[in-house]
Amino acid sequence: MNNKPEIAIIESNTLTCLGLKSILEEIIPMATIRTFHSFNELMDDTPDMYAHYFISAQIYVEHNAFFLPRKRKTIVLASDSPQFQLSGVPVLNIYEPEEKLVKSLLKLHQHAPVSYTHLTLPTIR
């Protein structure tokens, strides 16, 4: 059995997907990171196998029937605007500088339902 955690990024913005994937691969090297440009792409895969779902605010709103039961595994990619403060769903401010973004990801890890044995802070370029 494969114990390697899998993480899904569901976001239509290619640069956001690639940037987040790169950061996650640095801080969670033991994880498999998959990107999807739409909710339908995720549904065509095996949607319940993921340890975490990083999703755009729009996808969360449009498909909250899927993500609400998985809110402990769901992280919404948005700004820190009060309108994005969702009940019980972590929000990652994607407009922060890289160093703060990485620190926010590490803080989210502390409250994650899945444990990663060793996360490291990458060198900020």
Identify the residue ranges that each predicted region occupies.
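N-terminal regulatory/sensing modules of transcriptional regulators
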Residues: 1-113
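Conserved small/polar residues in nucleotide/adenosyl-binding loops
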Residues: 117-123
